[in-house]
Amino acid sequence: MIIKANGTEISVLLSPEQQNDYISLTDIAKYKNPDDPRIVISNWLSSYSTIDFLAAWETLYNPNFNRMEFHTVRNETGRLVLSAKQWIERMNAIGITSHAGRYGGTYAHADIAFEFASWISPEFKL
């Protein structure tokens, strides 16, 4: 399924097994950087406020969230740099998915995608 927001086409994965739709962060990121949206997503994931939000979401909805690994990453000294794949694998996260290949990309639960969209641009979220 495709939705349009602020003139940008955004893919939505309909996920019957998870009972939630996942919205393409890659497509949203193209609004800011059409050539390399992965950089935009990585920059967002490299913010402490972002990973705190994601951890709160995962704590609410994911009984298998790796809180110990989250605290390890959160308390590491130096600059925080995480890719979507690293976040998913290290935290056992379910709120974000990442798929390689032609029809791949990074997708997130609507709660997370809207948070990302508001980081891109407040108007984009609205």
Predicted features, each with a name:
Residues 1-126:
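An anion-engaging/catalytic patch
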